[in-house]
Each structure stands twice: as C-alpha cells, then as structure tokens.
Amino acid sequence: MDNFENPLLAPDQDVLLYLLDGYSQLQQLQKQQFNIHDDNINYNNNNNNNNNNNNNNNNNNNNNNNNNNNNNNNNIGSPQIMNENIETNSNDPQYLERLQSIQQQQHQCQTQIQQQLQNYQQQYEDQYQQRQQQYQDQYQKPYSSPPLNFNSIPPITNNNNNNNNNNNNNNNNNNSNSNSNSNSNSNSNSNSNSNSNSNNNNINNNICINNNDISIFLLNNQIQLQPLQQQQQQQQQQQQQQQQQQQQQQQQQQQQQQPTQPTQPTKPIQLTQPIQLTQPTLLEELKDISIQQQLLSAIQQTAQSPQQIHPLQQLQPYQLQSYQQIQASQQLQPYQQLIQLQQLQLQQLEEEKRQQQKQLLLQQQQLQEQQEKLQQQLLQQQKQQLKQKVKQQKQQHQKQQPQQQQQSIQIPPELQNYILNNNNNNNNNNTNKTLSPISEMIQNQFLNNQQTILNQNNSTLQLPTPFYSPQQQQQQHTPISSFIPPPSLPSSPPSPPSPPSPPPQQQQQQQQQQQQQQQQQQQQQQQQQQQQQQQLQQQQLQQQQLQQQHQLKESYESKESIKKYNQNIASRNYRLKKKDYIKEIENKIATLSLENNRLEKENGSIRTNGSIEMMRMEPESMKMLMDGKLIIENIKHALIIDDEKSLIYLLHQYHRTIDQRYSLLEKEVNKLINPYTQLRLCCIGYVPKSSPLVLNIFQGPESDKWLNLFKIEANITPEQSIKIDSLRFQYGKVSSRLSNELLELDLIIKRFFIKNVLPTPDTPLLNSDYYSEGELIPNTTTESIAPLNNFELLDFASKLESLKNKIILNASLGLDTFATLCSILTPKQEALLLVRVNLFCIDLHHHDILGEVWTNVNQISNSLSNPLTSFSDSMKKINFSFLQLDNNNNNYHYKIN
C-alpha cells in the first residue's frame, strides 16, 4: 500500500480511491438486488484450473484425479447433473458427513472474507485521511476529487482462454482413463475414492476465495475480466460437453457395477447430532451456489463499466443523510400522486352520487305528480263509465221487457194439442197413471226455462222499475203453466202408449223421417239464432249511436255551462275592480281637496300676515329645542338633589337629542341665504356690524369675569383652567377671521345688487359706509342696463354659496367649542355649565304669541274700511292670545314639576 502514497498526492490521479470505496459499496448494491444475506454468499472462482496446469505428471492416477477435478468444477452450476449425483449418493453416510464439513468450511470462509473486507475498509479510511492531510500540507488547499479519466485505466485482457484449453486437454485424458477403468475392478474402486476426494477439494476451492486475489483486486485494479455475454456462451458450451461426457461415464459405471461389489469395508461414523438432510435442502444449496455465480458475474460486469458507479466516497455522513432523504422523498412522490388521484376520483364519485340523488328525487316527484294526475283521470273515467252503464241498463231493460212478454205468450199449437189430448185421456179413463217419460222431460225443460226467465227478470229489476200499461201487467200476471219453450219438441203428435209394434222397415222409415225433421228443426233454430244475433247487433249499433249523440249533447252543454260560469266570474271581477277604482279616485279627490283648502288658507294667511308662516321654524328644530329645555330643567333638579347617576343619564340623553343640530342649522341658513332675502336686506340697508347682546363666554372682557366666577363655583383645577384658556384663545383667532370674511362677502353681494338690480337714477347713495369717499354711482336708467353674462351669474351664485358655508362654519364653531369645553369638565361641572349657559333658552310659546300679535296689528293697519269693527275684533284676538300665553306658561311649569 505504500507504493501508492506518492501518486495519490497529485490532484489528477484519484482513480484507486474511487475503486477501493466503490467495491465495498458495490457488494451492498448486489445484496439488495438479489435479496440474499451475507451468510449465503459464495465467491466461486473459475480460475481454479491453475492447479491442473501445475500438476501435469506422467502417472495415470494423478491425471484421473485432475480430470475429475476439472469436470466437477465445470459442473457445479448445472442443476441437472447435481440432482443425479444427489439421487445416487443421498443415502451414503459418508456423503452426508462430507456435506456437513463443507458447510462448516463455507461458513468459516464467509466470516473470514467479511473480516478482511472490514479491515480493508478501515485501512482505506485511515490512509485516505492521512493523504488528505498530506495534500493540504503540500498544496495548502482542501482536497477535491477530480473527475475520472477512464482513458488512463489499462485495458482489460482475457486470460480465460488458457483455462479453457486446459479443460479440453483434461477432457481428452478422461476418455483414456475411462477405457482403462473398464479393464479392472480394483481400478474402479480406487477411482471412486479418488473422485470423492477430488469433489471435496474442488468444492472447497470454489467456496473459499484466496485472500491474495482479493487484495490484488482491491489494490492493483488489474483483474482481467471477461464480458458477460461471452462468459455465458462459454459456460453453456462447457456444460453441454460435460453432460455428454458424464452420460458416457455413467453408462460405463453401470456396466461395471453389475458384476462387481465393493471390497473396502466402510467404517461406522459416529455423529454427535442426527443429521436429517433430504433432497430439497440439497437442491436449495445448489441453487444458492448458482445464484452466487450470478453475483460474481454481476460484480465483474460492474467492474468493467465503472461509469455506472456513483462516486459516494466524496460524500460526508451528513451528506449521506441528505442523499438518503432525497431518495426517500423521490420514492414517496408516486405514492403521494396516487393518493391525490384517488382523492380526486372519490370527490368526483361523490359529486356524481349527489347529482344522481338529485335526479332520482326529481324523478320521484315527477312520478308522484303523474300518478296523482292519472288517479284523477281514472276517477273521472270511472264516474263517466258508471253513468253510461246505468243509462244503458235502463234502455236495455225498457227494450227487453216487451220481447220477453211476447216470448212468454207465444206457444206452438202442437204443444197445445198435446196438452189437451193428455187432459182428455186422463178424464175418460179416470186412472191415476203417471205421465209418459216424454211429458216428464217437457215439464222439466219447462221448469228450467221458467227459472232462467225469473233470474233474468230479477237481474233487470235491480234498476228502478218503469211504468207499465194495464195490458202489459195482465200479460205479466198470466199463470206460469202457460209458458212453454219452443225448442227441443217434435212437430208431430206423440204416439199412443201401447200401439202394436210396426215392422222393421216401417221403423227405419220413421227413424229417417224423425232425423229429417230434427235436421229441419236444427236448421230453423240456426236461422232463428242468426236473425236474433243480427237484431242484437243492430240494437247495439243504435245504442252506440244514441250514446254518442248523448255525449255530444252533454259535452256541448258542459262547454256552454263553463262559458257561462266564466263569463259570470269575469263580470263579477270587473264590477269589483270598477268599485275599487272608483274608491281610489274618490280618495285621491278628497286628499286633493284637503290640500287645496290648506293651501288656500296658507295663501290667505300669507297675504294678511306678510309671509310670517313661511319664516316659521321647522317642527324638527322646535321639537329639539323643547326637548333640550326639559332635559336642562331635570339636570337643575338633579344638581339640587346631588344625584350623580341621574346626572350621567341626563347628559347622555342631552347629547343624543343634539345630534341633529348641524342638519337643522343648514335648513335655517338656506332660508336666509337666497337672492330674495338678500335683495330685501339690501333695500332696507341692513349692515351686520353690531354685535349681539347675548353673552359670549369665549370672547370679550365680560366672558373673563363670567369664567372666573364659574371656575370658583365648579371647583375647576389649574390643569382644566389652562386647557380652557387655550381653547378660548383658539376660538378668538378663528372667529375673528370668519367675521372679516363674512363682512367682505356681504359687501360684494350688496354691491352686485345695487349695480345690476337696483339702479336708481339721480338718487344719492343710501348707505355711504359701503363705498369709499372717491367712489361715485353712475347716473343710469333702466334702459341703459346691460344684460348679465353667464360668468357673472355663476360668480354671484358661488359667492352666495360661500356666504352660506361661512355662516354655517361660524355657528358650528360655537357648538364645537362648547362640546370640547364639556369634554374637559367632569359630569357635575358639565351639568353646572349647561344650567348656567342654557343654550336652549328660546321660549317658543312667547315667540308664537308675539307672531299672532304682529299679525293682528297688521290686520288693524290694513282694515281701513271699517276701522271700529276691525279694531274691536283685533283687540279681542290680542286678549285671547295673551290668555293662551298665561295658560301655556302654567302647563309648562306643571310638566316640569
């Protein structure tokens, strides 16, 4: 191994490392492919024929031994020949003992081979690590295995041809030896012993592999192998030759063994344990040997093709684990795909089942509906059929009764004469003779016919009996004895009971006559039956025609009745709809009339009162003011009682009622900010400069005094006072800016009205405050006013919109600052603030009374025709309004208390 240290240090020569590590892994791969344990591996070697080349002596016995050895070596893999040997030698105890010893030797060889392989692997790993360190020390970089250059590997040569030549020479020697064996019995015995010994030696040679050969394979890599196909062909040829030779030998041995017997006595063999070895176990061992040969051939094939070996010597332990995980995941991928496919198939099957169930349910519903329809149709058909049957039975009964009466009355004259003759004979003779057999037959037939007629009458009488005339009733009540059926009676009168016997010729003639008469009667009966059938068919046709006519009439009548019924329903529905429509129109007319009256009253009040009703506050805002006032009164009462829970509840209620204050404020501003009100303010000369008299708690010197007193009363902390002062400062800045913007917009709007809407020629300026001193108004007339442009109109509308927004911002500024001030304070302090400020201090009752007084005063000023009466009426109204004011105040205080 020391010879290979120096060349392995170069990075270009790493082939032996690959082969050394590849052989140990190749052994494991072959085990996995054939599913064979380590205990059953037998490394057979076909190169044992070298012993034959070294032992070519002149003695015939030695040549026989060598030839037998070669034959046994070549025939180990053939199961047919071994089966024959097993059959011949399975009962020999020596053979069994030898097999046992062979098995032990085989096991020992296997253990030795495994130990040697382990030692080689350990040595290789140690040397590989040492060489890596040497490489790193010399080249100062980590070792990396280069790619394999198979061109550098020496070519593989075949040396098995020499072995084959040796085998052929040995086979020729066998033929000569076999001839010599046939001459003497002693030589045959010696040959048999020598054959047994040679078998043992050859088996041992095949089982045990020389350690030197393994070392040569591992180190030098100069094992000369043969391709797999050529080797198989050679083995087949050898097996065929060996089979032919063995057959010849067996024939010769059989010829020799018949006259001879074994001379050498066999010694008894004492075994420690009883060996039970049967033919199948031996066959299994031989099969294992053949499998081992296949393993060796596969190893040789892999040695010939080193490109297929994966260079696993480069992988570290952690890399091997990752490699194994990747292989496991690759193996599991197809199973996962199969599982996914099965899941998809299951989902599809479930969906198909659901669809089938839905279809079945729909089909069942349809079948049920069809069954119900069919049942209804069957019931209707059954009812119609019953009606038709009843009608048919009535008609048949009416038609059959006169026919039965006629049949019952018609009696043939022959029977009447016969009955009269019988009665006369009985009266003359005064004998109690019995009737003749003919008369008895006639009577029996008569009675049977009577019974059938009675049964028919009973069946027909189940229906309601029709009305008969008196003649028909008499015919019906005639005695039953008068009814005699016409058939089965001879036309001639019967012969007397005791006449003289006529001759045979006369009897024959009489019989012939009787037969002719009977035939005539039968023909007549057939004709009558045919006539009756024709009559019945005609009657049935007539009945069917009548039924069809009756059905047509009924269908026509039913259709007409349905039409009449539908017409009645349609007319009734039309009348009801007409009534409903008339009622709707009347209600609409009533509502329109009420609206008209209300509008007339409003117009009259507007004319008289000067549009006071139009300027009235909205009912929603009035409701909000009244509710807020009531809540503040309740808060005042809770402060007196010092009830914190009620205060908190009332404050929540107060904030809930004030939610709509912004929307109501916009509605009130829209009433003021429009061209009509602005025109009136401009005509009047209104100037929004004067501040209101209401106290503003956020701005001005008076607010400072009020807030200082409130802080003392509400026990406000210094932190709260700082926040309140900063809030007031911010409010002052924003309110001053908004007030200036409002004044500018108001001036611009007033100038627009004065220039374009109210040009008064030769008149001085009404309010000189709007203009500067040098500004003059042009002396114009209505004719000289130019039309307005669209741009000017849009600009004026935008100015009005901005004025509305500024007013809303100014009003909402006060509300927002008040809300932030309430958030700074505690609930009790907030309640004190609401009670002291009282934003909802407007008394709407007083305001309404003042409006009524104003309307009455205007009416007094307008009524000039009859001033006394109008003045007295107006004074009455004023007094009445004052009385209402007092009553409202009393009611309001009563509600609060």
Swiss-Prot record:
<dbReference type="GO" id="GO:0043565">
    <property type="term" value="F:sequence-specific DNA binding"/>
</dbReference>
<feature type="coiled-coil region">
    <location>
        <begin position="330"/>
        <end position="407"/>
    </location>
</feature>
<keyword id="KW-0805">Transcription regulation</keyword>
<dbReference type="GO" id="GO:0005634">
    <property type="term" value="C:nucleus"/>
</dbReference>
<feature type="compositionally biased region" description="Low complexity">
    <location>
        <begin position="128"/>
        <end position="140"/>
    </location>
</feature>
<feature type="region of interest" description="Leucine-zipper">
    <location>
        <begin position="569"/>
        <end position="576"/>
    </location>
</feature>
<comment type="similarity">
    <text>Belongs to the bZIP family.</text>
</comment>
<feature type="region of interest" description="Disordered">
    <location>
        <begin position="128"/>
        <end position="198"/>
    </location>
</feature>
<feature type="compositionally biased region" description="Low complexity">
    <location>
        <begin position="44"/>
        <end position="75"/>
    </location>
</feature>
<dbReference type="InterPro" id="IPR046347">
    <property type="entry name" value="bZIP_sf"/>
</dbReference>
<keyword id="KW-0539">Nucleus</keyword>
<feature type="compositionally biased region" description="Pro residues">
    <location>
        <begin position="484"/>
        <end position="505"/>
    </location>
</feature>
<feature type="compositionally biased region" description="Polar residues">
    <location>
        <begin position="76"/>
        <end position="88"/>
    </location>
</feature>
<feature type="region of interest" description="Disordered">
    <location>
        <begin position="461"/>
        <end position="516"/>
    </location>
</feature>
<dbReference type="GO" id="GO:0010737">
    <property type="term" value="P:protein kinase A signaling"/>
</dbReference>
<keyword id="KW-0175">Coiled coil</keyword>
<dbReference type="GO" id="GO:0031288">
    <property type="term" value="P:sorocarp morphogenesis"/>
</dbReference>
<feature type="coiled-coil region">
    <location>
        <begin position="94"/>
        <end position="137"/>
    </location>
</feature>
<feature type="compositionally biased region" description="Low complexity">
    <location>
        <begin position="158"/>
        <end position="198"/>
    </location>
</feature>
<feature type="compositionally biased region" description="Low complexity">
    <location>
        <begin position="506"/>
        <end position="516"/>
    </location>
</feature>
<feature type="compositionally biased region" description="Polar residues">
    <location>
        <begin position="141"/>
        <end position="157"/>
    </location>
</feature>
<dbReference type="GO" id="GO:0003700">
    <property type="term" value="F:DNA-binding transcription factor activity"/>
</dbReference>
<protein>
    <recommendedName>
        <fullName>Probable basic-leucine zipper transcription factor R</fullName>
    </recommendedName>
</protein>
<feature type="region of interest" description="Disordered">
    <location>
        <begin position="38"/>
        <end position="88"/>
    </location>
</feature>
<keyword id="KW-0804">Transcription</keyword>
<feature type="domain" description="bZIP">
    <location>
        <begin position="557"/>
        <end position="620"/>
    </location>
</feature>
<keyword id="KW-0238">DNA-binding</keyword>
<comment type="function">
    <text>Probable transcriptional regulator.</text>
</comment>
<feature type="region of interest" description="Basic motif">
    <location>
        <begin position="559"/>
        <end position="564"/>
    </location>
</feature>
<dbReference type="GO" id="GO:0010468">
    <property type="term" value="P:regulation of gene expression"/>
</dbReference>
<feature type="coiled-coil region">
    <location>
        <begin position="228"/>
        <end position="258"/>
    </location>
</feature>
<dbReference type="InterPro" id="IPR004827">
    <property type="entry name" value="bZIP"/>
</dbReference>
